[in-house]
Design a protein with these regions (language model features):
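Membrane-interfacial helix-loop connectors
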Residues: 1-50, 131-211, 216
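Selected transmembrane alpha-helices and immediately adjacent juxtamembrane segments
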Residues: 51-151, 177, 213-236
Length: 236
């Protein structure tokens, strides 16, 4: 999960729009997913996917930055921000060397792990439960080529799922082989990796529900747009 890194970025004073751009992009575009994509779909589709994933993160982060959403971070993370600021200020005033900061750094890291561990377990359990109950052939029937609404349906169907990009690439390869348009399949992949109920369970530790809804709504809109653009650019 990218959540601990997201927390670290926020604690480090990095603007929230930049941290959101990281949160969106990091699960979508990574070396394993790109390698699998290259083998499954070739250079052209891989390049378009990688560029669109990066642009999705950049645009999503830029839009979310304009909303000034810091006030919607959870009380837990805001408490960590205050504590971190006080510690950093004291270290700078005293010129504390790095080796003497190590114990505090490890303590803070452990507090973050303890804070999100339960939510990680809940998210994984929810994803596993959904994987076990989805009927065979359901997704292919819902995302067939003749339906104009296939892209938003693909995104909605992906929300209960939970998987990383490397795990989902073989799945969308099967979808495409069974006639699902490539843009629709990739929208499903992006939503599975970047948007899901288990992901919301993880984010609840660091965000209020209002911020989660804003984040999910913004990213959903961009993923649906990306799916339609893919279907236009890579029409059969």
């Amino acid at each position: 999960s990218s959540i601990p890194l997201f927390i670290g970025f926020v604690k480090g004073g990095i603007p929230l729009g930049v941290t959101f751009a990281f949160l969106i992009t990091s699960p979508l575009v990574n070396e394993v997913a790109i390698a699998l994509f290259l083998g499954a779909f070739g250079v052209k589709i891989t390049v378009i996917y990688a560029v669109s994933g990066i642009l999705l993160g950049m645009m999503g982060g830029a839009v979310l930055e304009r909303f000034r959403l810091e006030r919607y971070l959870s009380p837990w993370i805001r408490g960590l921000l205050v504590q971190s600021g006080e510690e950093s200020g004291a270290w700078e005033r005293k010129g504390t060397p790095f080796r003497k900061r190590w114990a505090v750094i490890m303590h803070d890291a452990w507090e973050i792990v303890k804070g999100v561990a339960l939510y990680v377990v809940i998210g994984i359990a929810m994803g596993a439960a959904v994987h076990g109950y989805v009927p065979e052939g359901f997704f292919e029937a819902s995302m067939s080529r003749e339906h104009w609404w296939a892209v938003p349906v693909a995104v909605i169907c992906a929300v209960p799922m939970y998987a990383n990009a490397a795990a989902i690439v073989p799945v969308i390869q099967v979808f495409v082989a069974k006639g699902v348009p490539i843009g629709t399949a990739i929208a499903f992949m992006m939503a599975t990796v970047g948007l899901s109920v288990p992901e919301a369970a993880l984010l609840k530790k660091v965000m209020t529900w209002k911020l989660i809804w804003i984040f999910f709504g913004t990213v959903t809109a961009f993923i649906i747009l990306s799916g339609y653009v893919f279907n236009i650019l890579i029409a059969p």
